[in-house]
């Protein structure tokens, strides 16, 4: 039986502004004769449980109303559920987050009406899904990322970002300017299929999509559907290097710096030389430990 679409909305997305759009979204979905059931998250991470329950109820199509964090958790829920092949589940997006990085990467309109029209048209594409296995002292965790995951400065900033959230899309910029003086490079061993190196890292991450962190372009020319991770490594940065390159993170010209390396691999391992290595993904702290990254090729079926 066709259950239609399960619409999952995060009312706290964009500092609560998404909640005000609910009635408009429902009206537009009805006007397009899109059959749907409505689910609202009440706490962080509830998207995963909602997806698991909805799949058990027969839903095979989901609409995410929110930002990158909401999308990431819905897709994680699709992977975790045991009822059907995750590739057979379709996800559409009405992007109402602060950054909407994934929506930009897959060229989903940021306008609500146009995004809903895309869902109505029903055209789909396949996209890669990133995975990181975090081997900590007491447990091993597996987390999924739709855009970018890494270590270094951006993970350092995420721990301090909460008090800047009220600034919306400028939160990361303000947090970075206020706190970059306190960051110290971390020496990391990094291994891929055809490379092995040890560097003092300012920023090191892997991605399957172009944008992250509210528009930063840290990943160079990701295909997003070839089963490969694109790694970017900024090493031996001084405070002057950070200042010089800060805005280059947003326009893509950071790759012109000789201290920035890029490489492609299907599997990448990162191990700290000393201490603990904190990993983040899609704007969320995932955990600390030794890291192994890989890709589930064309694992996501999304509206385009």
Q: Model-flagged regions — what are they?
A:
Residues 47, 70-74, 101, 127:
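Short glycine/serine/threonine-rich phosphate/pyrophosphate-binding segments
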Residues 150, 154, 205-219:
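Glycine-rich phosphate/pyrophosphate-binding beta-alpha loops
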Residues 165-171, 214, 220-241:
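Gly/Ser/Thr-rich active-site loops/lids in small-molecule metabolic enzymes
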